[in-house]
Amino acid sequence: MAHAAQVGLQDATSPIMEELIIFHDHALMIIFLICFLVLYALFLTLTTKLTNTSISDAQEMETVWTILPAIILVLIALPSLRILYMTDEVNDPSFTIKSIGHQWYWTYEYTDYGGLIFNSYMLPPLFLEPGDLRLLDVDNRVVLPVEAPVRMMITSQDVLHSWAVPTLGLKTDAIPGRLNQTTFTATRPGVYYGQCSEICGANHSFMPIVLELIPLKIFEMGPVFTL
Amino acid sequence: GIGPIHPLQPEERQIGSVKLLGFLDVENTPCARHSILYGSLGSAVAGFGHFLFTSRIRRSCDVGVGGFILVTLGCWFHCRYNYAKQRIQERIAREEIKKKILYEGTHLDPERKHNGSSSN
């Protein structure tokens, strides 16, 4: 989960998120260099004694400041497209879970496991125990195995919602009447948090998502059924 | 930064981090510190060298800034390429170790197949 006043990305829990962090570092370095150049140009503009305002016919400069941004955009676009197509790769998921957004909770269906269905409500502050996270913890977590490709089918029963888990690099809109699909493979066990990411009414901020990722051996023993 | 495990707590990580222009975290971004340092060195060498030859201050500053950008970019791509290669090698090594642990002693053990074919 994010710590207080965190600005940067959370640590990665899936290979796609690792790639996204690498791309983010790459884009940020290019942005830093562009900002540095612009700040220097601004400094020169503010400290020059030259005041000629009718400069014209600077073909070389115009060529440079057209070609250079095009090259920069290509340098950014190529890795971006690579990751975009990587997220759409079909990787033969081990099983499928359906996530349905409601106002203001999530319903999860484990149809591969005998039709287990449960709701996941945020824990109200009065029901929090010491160590629980305010506005993040839920009554029933989504329990999943580590290192197994999982397919999430996401939809909504009423208005638009969005199922997001930042550490996995996931954000998929829950649209009524439409079934969106996303797949992921978690690389390490733990409890990971996300929040609804599409404005959906008064309690939009109070319908979090909690994934509990456990080793496959323990998952197969069936703890997810003990509700 | 990248990687699931960091030895420092988030608060400690924040105290140690230096953010250039307020957003580029050079401590926690792989290759950033290395690139910026070499870029600064390149900028100083290029700018000062140009000044020694031409005695033009303004143009030397421009050469210094240009040198910083080019050297930083060059070091950055070189370092990131090697970093990506290293990550791929680590992943291959991890997979091979996992396979070895799983298949050692079984009929699927690649070493047993190799030894069997060489003895024949």
Swiss-Prot record, chain A:
> Where along this sequence does the record place binding of Cu cation A2?
196, 198, 200, 204
Q: Name one GO biological process term.
A: ATP synthesis coupled electron transport
Sample GO molecular function, one term: copper ion binding
* Enzyme Commission number(s) from the entry: 7.1.1.9
- State the membrane topology: Multi-pass membrane protein
Membrane spanning residue stretches: 15-45, 60-87
- Mitochondrial intermembrane face: residue ranges? 1-14, 88-227
Query: What Pfam families does the entry give?
Result: COX2, COX2_TM
Assembly, per entry: Component of the cytochrome c oxidase (complex IV, CIV), a multisubunit enzyme composed of 14 subunits. The complex is composed of a catalytic core of 3 subunits MT-CO1, MT-CO2 and MT-CO3, encoded in the mitochondrial DNA, and 11 supernumerary subunits COX4I, COX5A, COX5B, COX6A, COX6B, COX6C, COX7A, COX7B, COX7C, COX8 and NDUFA4, which are encoded in the nuclear genome.
Q: What is this protein called?
A: Cytochrome c oxidase subunit 2
Could you tell me which species this protein originates from? Answer: Pan troglodytes (Chimpanzee)
Gene assigned in the entry: MT-CO2
